[in-house]
Swiss-Prot record:
Subunit structure as annotated in this protein's UniProt entry: Interacts with GyrB.
Protein's UniProt name: DNA gyrase inhibitor YacG
Membership in a protein family: Belongs to the DNA gyrase inhibitor YacG family.
Source species: Legionella pneumophila subsp. pneumophila (strain Philadelphia 1 / ATCC 33152 / DSM 7513)
Binding site for Zn(2+): 9, 12, 28, 32
Cofactor: how bound: Binds 1 zinc ion.
Source domain of life: Bacteria
Family annotation (PANTHER family): DNA GYRASE INHIBITOR YACG
Length: 70
């Protein structure tokens, strides 16, 4: 019995098998994976929601004190 799940590539809709050895899953190929990355980078893909006012973003100082150096 074959229990491997068939999925469609989110970019080209090509059917492929969800397998641990598919390094590009859920995409069918490196090409489709890079197309998706490019769409996120160019902001043609976004998570819907309200815009955030940059002035309201709280920043933190992540520097750690180096106690051992004296």
């Amino acid at each position: 019995m074959n229990n491997q799940q068939k999925i469609k590539c989110p970019i080209c809709d090509k059917q492929n098998t969800w397998r641990p050895d598919n390094l590009f899953r859920p995409f069918c190929s490196e090409r489709c994976k890079l197309i998706d990355l490019g769409e996120w980078a160019s902001e043609s893909r976004k998570i819907p929601g309200s815009s955030i006012d940059p002035e309201s973003i709280v920043t933190t100082n992540n520097k750690q004190d180096n106690v051992d150096e004296q």
